[in-house]
Amino acid sequence: MSQPSSRSAVGTSLPTGLMLFALFFGAGNLIFPPLLGAASGRSFIPVMAGFIATGVLMPLITVVAVSTSGEGILGLARRVGPRFGTVMPLAVYLAIGPLYAIARVTTVAYELATRPVLELWGFHDSRLALLVHVTVFMGVSFSIARSPSRLADRVGRWLTPALLALLALLCGVTILMSPGMEREAIGPYASDPLTTGLTQGYLTMDVLAATVFGIVVITSLRERGLTSPRALVRGTILSGGIAAALLGLVYIGLAVLGTRTRGQITADTKDGTELLRNAASSTLGTSGVVIFAAIVILACLTTAVGLLASWAGYAYTAWPAVSFNRQLAACAIVSFTLANLGLSAILKIAGPLLFLLYPFAIALVAVTLVDALAPGRLRAAYRWCVTTAGILGSVSAITAAGWDGPSKLLARTGLWSDSTGWILPALLALGIGIVLDVRSGAWSTPAPGEPPSQVQHDVEHAAASQL
C-alpha cells in the first residue's frame, strides 16, 4: 500500500495537529505565560526561550519518542525492565488521569471561569455551585470522550478554532489598546532567567501529558491512512510541529499581554490569573470577563476530553475484560469525586508528584531518542539513566513534600538544585550506560523479535477500541 504524498501527508496531519494543540493547551498553559511576561522585565527573551524549550519543544520530542516505539509509554517503559514497564505507565496515567489532572483541570475551570461569571451575575461561591459545575463539566467531557475515533474531528474542527479565536481577540485587543509597561525583572527572573523559564515550563505538565497523548495521536493518524512505522513517525512529527507552532505563538502572545497588563507582581506570585482577569475586564469590560471564562472553559474541556479518552484506552489495554466505556465511566466518577473536594485540596499533592515523575519521564525519553540512533537496542543505558534520574528526582519530591534533609546534604556538594540537580548525574549515567552497551555488543546487535503481547497491540486498541 503506497503512502500519502508530502502534500497529502500534511493534510492528513493537520487535523491531528490541531487536536494535539487543543489537548496540550490546558489551564496551566494559560496562566503561566502572562506571569512570565510581567515578571521578566528586560529578561523577557531568555525567560521565554526557557519556557518554550520545556513547554513546547520537550513535549514535541516526547510525542515523537513515543511514536518511535510503536507501543506508547508502555513500550518505552518496558525497555527499562518488566517491573518498571508496569509501574511507570500506571503511575503516569493515574497522575494525568483520575487521581489528579482531570480533577485539577475541572476545578481550575471553576475557579477561573464559572466562579467569576457567577459573581458577575450576583451569585456567591458555594459548594452547590462547585457541584453543579463539576457535574456539567464532567458530563460534557465524558460525552465527547465516548467516541475517541471521532476525537480529532470533534476537538480539532470545532473546539480548537473557537479557542484560537477567543485567544486572538483577548490578546489582540489588550496589546493594541494597552501601552507597554516598564517593569524590572523580579526575583529569580532577574537572577537566573533562563533556568526560571525552564522550570516554569515543567509546570505545564505537558511532558507527562505527551506520553499519554502520543497514543491518541498515533491512533488518529492510523485512521487517516498512515500505517507504516516510517509514515507514522513522519505524521507524528508533522502533527507535533503544527501543535508546537501554535503553542509557541499563543505563549508569546500571552506573555506580551502580561507585559501590557497592570497588576501587582511579586516574587511570590505563582500564576498569571489576576493578570488575565485584569486584561479581560480593563480592555473588554463586562464582556471581557465572559470571554475570559470561555477561553478557560475551552482550554480545560479539551484537555479533560483527551485525558479521559487516554486513560480509558490505557485501562482497556491493561484490563481488556472491562470495556472501554466502563473504564471511561469509572475514570469520570473518580475525577468527579475528587474535583468536588476543591482546588486547594487537589493541589497539595501536585508538587511532590511532579518532582517524582518528571525525571523518570524525561530520562526515559532521552534514552529512547539515543536508542533510535543505535543499530541495536540499548539496555544498560536505560537502566543507568532512568534509575539515576528517579533516585535524585525522589529527593526533590521529598523536599517538595516538606522534608529537606536529603536535599541539604546534596547541596553541600555545590552542584545540587532541587529543580534541575538530577539532570547532570542522569546524563553521566546515560554515558556510562552507552559505554557498557557498546562493550557488551547491545549497541550494534539488533534486538531479537519479541512474541506478540497485549502491549504490542497498545496503539491499535488504546484509544480506538470500544465494546
List each model region and its residues.
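Select transmembrane alpha-helical segments in multipass membrane proteins
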Residues: 9-20, 45, 82-96, 131-135, ...
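Transmembrane alpha-helical segments of multi-pass small-molecule transport proteins
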Residues: 15, 20, 24, 91, ...
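Hydrophobic, membrane-embedded alpha-helices of multi-pass small-molecule transporters
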Residues: 15-25, 94-98, 171-180, 188-257, ...
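Hydrophobic transmembrane alpha-helices that form the core helical bundles
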Residues: 35, 85-121, 300-316
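Membrane-water interface regions at transmembrane-helix termini and the short interhelical loops
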Residues: 67-74, 137-159, 223-226, 337-349, ...
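Membrane-interface loop-to-helix entry segments
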Residues: 144-174, 240, 350-362, 381-391
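A generic transmembrane alpha-helix motif of multi-pass inner-membrane proteins
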Residues: 177, 186, 382-467
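Extracellular/periplasmic helix-exit of transmembrane alpha-helices
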Residues: 245-275
